[in-house]
């Protein structure tokens, strides 16, 4: 959530940001917000004046009663009327506060100066040129769907029978390979990169979604259990960030770095017309997430660290990839700056997003009220929050299967995963 003081002082900058994000239609909300804010200020001032008058007259009434000289009846009637007026103002003030908060919750984050201005994904900049590794794929390639079916390690049809399209089933050595990926990534982040592992809940309340910015703007993308009023998490970012919701963090503990595995659930509303085959777009997938809480002056250095940590996984797996710096028209509403890491699919002949690494500055912390004090007597400040996929396994699995396939139709397991799988190859004989 944006700081309303920033909007008051620099409304033109916020309007420019909306235009750069291709959200010019949201511009009237800024004027509406400022009008409501002025109305609120006037109401607060009037209410405070009346409360001061009530306090003053209440003392006069007490003096009259104490002295026994004169009558306080008329003053009491006047103050009853004043109290009723104050109560009405407080009710109106509550409604105004709700309107203001609704607008603030719907506004996107500001943008970092380094974010390129652009209209769509076509305007994203290549931050790191494609990183390649030597593969000898000089034979007719199978895509991940064909490999999964022929080796009996993936079953999308039975997943659809159980739950509907978009819910894959991993079988036998496919399940072992998926588990190996998750364990390898967690071990890298905790043992090499210094993150603390967390195993979070897979369901959260609405306040948690609100804290990280998925609610109310992206309410149509999350699965809701109506009876218990809980939501399936779209990413571990939600429960992990909200671990510290409403807390005052000790500056000595910053930065805080967490790594977490979770299943992720997304309705993918509006995906009609997009490529939804196999792992390309699913409703349930596995992901290892990195989340950081930092001091404001350290957050952009932390963003580069998160990106490098995600890249380290792909380098170890020898998966070809590239890094994009997202433009203003493609970056998520919550982020001030974001890198996308894309893996190469040799069968599809295109790049697939496998990780997003974002800095939210104080946008989430303000919504979730996560603060710290730089010194014991200092004014509390909001922390900066960051997150990055480290990584999502679904599209990573696409690239892995397709790059590590052989002419005979088997899959060689990447060397760094063999310690976890306890096998080197997946062949037609897989169970």
From Swiss-Prot:
Q: Does the record's keyword annotation contain Aminoacyl-tRNA synthetase?
A: yes
- Protein biosynthesis: present as a keyword of the record? yes
Localisation: Cytoplasm
Question: Which PROSITE patterns does the record cross-reference, listed alphabetically?
Answer: AA_TRNA_LIGASE_II
Pfam families found in the cross-reference section: Seryl_tRNA_N, tRNA-synt_2b
EC number of the protein: 6.1.1.11
Q: In terms of domain of life, where is this protein from? A: Bacteria
Matching NCBIfam families: serS
Q: What is this protein called?
A: Serine--tRNA ligase
């Amino acid at each position: 959530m944006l700081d309303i003081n920033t909007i008051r002082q620099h409304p033109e900058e916020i309007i420019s940001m909306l235009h750069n994000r291709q959200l010019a239609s949201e511009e009237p909300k800024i004027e509406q917000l400022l009008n409501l804010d002025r109305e609120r200020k006037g109401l607060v001032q009037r209410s405070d004046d009346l409360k001061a008058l009530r306090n003053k007259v209440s003392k006069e009434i007490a003096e009259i009663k104490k002295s026994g000289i004169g009558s306080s009846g008329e003053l009491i009637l006047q103050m009853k009327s004043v109290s009723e007026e104050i109560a009405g103002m407080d009710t109106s003030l509550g409604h105004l506060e709700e309107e203001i908060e609704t607008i603030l919750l719907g506004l996107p984050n500001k943008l970092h100066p380094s974010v390129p201005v652009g209209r769509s994904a076509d305007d994203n900049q290549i931050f790191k040129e494609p990183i390649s590794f030597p593969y000898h794929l000089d034979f007719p390639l199978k895509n991940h769907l064909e490999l999964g079916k022929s080796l009996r390690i993936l079953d999308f049809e039975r997943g659809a029978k159980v739950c509907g399209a978009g819910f894959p089933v991993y079988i036998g050595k496919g399940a072992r390979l998926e588990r190996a990926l998750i364990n390898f990534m967690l071990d890298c982040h905790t043992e090499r990169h210094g993150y603390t592992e967390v195993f979070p809940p897979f369901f959260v309340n609405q306040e948690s979604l609100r804290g990280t910015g998925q609610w109310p703007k992206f309410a149509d993308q999350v699965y809701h259990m109506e009876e218990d009023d809980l939501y399936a998490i779209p990413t571990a970012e939600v429960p992990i960030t909200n671990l510290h919701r409403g807390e005052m963090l000790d500056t000595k503990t910053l930065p805080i770095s967490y790594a977490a595995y979770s299943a992720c659930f997304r309705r993918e509303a509006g995906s009609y017309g997009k490529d939804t085959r196999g792992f390309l777009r699913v409703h349930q997938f596995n992901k290892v997430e990195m989340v950081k809480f930092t001091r404001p002056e350290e957050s952009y250095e932390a963003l580069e660290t998160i990106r490098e940590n995600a890249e380290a996984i792909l380098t170890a797996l020898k998966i070809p990839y590239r890094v994009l710096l997202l433009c203003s028209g493609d970056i998520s509403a919550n982020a001030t700056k974001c890198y996308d890491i894309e893996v190469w699919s040799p069968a599809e002949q295109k790049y697939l997003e496998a990780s997003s690494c974002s800095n939210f500055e104080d946008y989430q912390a303000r919504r979730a009220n996560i603060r710290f004090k730089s010194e014991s007597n200092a004014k509390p400040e909001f922390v900066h929050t960051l997150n990055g996929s480290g990584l999502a396994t679904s599209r990573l699995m696409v690239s892995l299967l397709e790059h590590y396939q052989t002419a005979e139709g088997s899959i060689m397991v990447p060397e760094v995963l063999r310690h976890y799988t306890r096998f080197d190859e997946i062949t037609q004989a897989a169970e």
